[in-house]
Regions:
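N-terminal prepro-regions of secreted/extracellular proteins
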Residues: 10-12, 33-36
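C-terminal segment of classical bacterial N-terminal signal peptides
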Residues: 25-34
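Generic hydrophobic-segment detector
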Residues: 9-10, 14, 26-27, 133
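Signature of Gram-negative chaperone-usher
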Residues: 35-228
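Long hydrophobic alpha-helices with heptad-repeat/coiled-coil character
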Residues: 8, 23-26, 217, 221
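Bacterial N-terminal signal peptides that target proteins for export
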Residues: 4-20
Length: 228
């Protein structure tokens, strides 16, 4: 039986149809897929310390010229700095008092800074030497403030002696001069704005003269405490 062979034109049409079908399948969009990956960021904390960056230090006071009257002479308190890197947020405070440790005097007392001063041997306090009473030195922080430094942004501590505080207080009754309440004082803060009369010495009319080269001197103890 004679079979009619496919004409070249029919084969070409079938081939063209097959190619178009494959192209259509290849061009059809497939559903998009997304890959998710979980991640975390974490760090630990090592606490630092509560410390003075620059310790408090009262300046020297000019020479007192006796005139038979009670006198007050003044000087400017040097700035100091506190750094709280403890991370507790408990706050802190600074207190000061006279220091009665060995070789020290908690009140202004006659002192020889040289090997000898007249008939007194030195250096050191003169045994049974003249003294001024406790509470002769006043710190006045009126107008002073604390400035954050080194990028600190925490709440500032507060001065406590805007009406004046005695810094040569008895050792058992220290005077609080600065307080940072709970949640404040975190970071580093430096004092600013002490006036030229922020330290005052009250010298009574009974102040005794000293031998050549001698001074009145007092030892003070500044304490930085955790908690306000």
């Amino acid at each position: 039986m004679y079979k009619h062979a496919s004409s070249p034109r029919r084969r070409w049409i079938r081939l063209l149809f097959s190619t178009a079908a494959i192209s259509a399948v290849a061009a059809a969009p497939f559903p998009a897929s997304a890959l998710a990956s979980d991640d975390i960021v974490q760090f630990s904390v090592i606490p630092g310390s509560l410390d003075f960056g620059a310790s408090p230090g009262l300046p020297g006071i000019s020479t007192l010229v006796l005139n038979g009257q009670a006198q007050t002479i003044s000087s400017r308190v040097a700035n100091f700095e506190v750094s709280d890197a403890s991370g507790t947020g408990l706050g802190w405070s600074i207190s000061v008092s006279g220091d009665d440790g060995p070789g020290k005097s908690p009140v202004l007392k006659q002192y020889c800074p040289a090997l000898e001063c007249g008939d007194h041997a030195g250096p050191g306090y003169v045994a049974d030497g003249s003294t001024l009473p406790a509470n002769s030195l006043t710190l006045d922080s009126n107008g002073a403030t604390f400035m954050p430094v080194h990028g600190s942004t925490g709440l500032r501590p507060a001065h406590q002696c805007n009406a004046g505080c005695f810094v040569d207080a008895p050792p058992l009754s220290p005077t609080k001069v600065v307080a940072a309440a709970s949640g404040t004082g975190m970071g580093t803060f430096r004092t600013s704005g002490f006036s030229s009369s922020s330290l005052r010495l009250a010298a009574p009319d009974s102040t005794r003269r000293l031998q050549t080269g001698e001074l009145y001197r007092v030892d003070l103890s500044w304490t930085l405490n955790s908690g306000p």
